[in-house]
């Protein structure tokens, strides 16, 4: 009888310890997820910003991106896959094994030729002064220096599903047509938070 009682106490003690460890692990994951999904620090700042009826015209300075193409996937899945590939690049999968700070926004647009989606991370400005961006360790990633450009921007909040993004893009296209503004590139969605 004593042996059985002692065994039951030991089992309850182990269950209590496992429960406490589970709670601590969940708390750690919750904290980490909060940090990982919070807005990232550096973002490309527009040089000029003109508010219009329903959108904003902005001129952005030249900037460098790490980009990849995801083919054969739908909009949301393409963002996840592209984000994973680019996240490995900034996490050290490059010739310098260098970790690169995450910046905002993450860009996703349809390619003009060849189909698929181009996903791009804007790289921090300080890489320019330190010899440029490290070369990717994955052949699916390339580095591209983009010239200064004007962009028509329609800010929206919420999760950028393919349907919601398409709706916002259609509204922006109508507004630009109304104002006689022609576009030079296919539209892109710029997200300031991770895609999960």
Regions found by a protein language model. Give the residues of each.
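A solvent-exposed interaction/effector surface
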Residues: 2-196
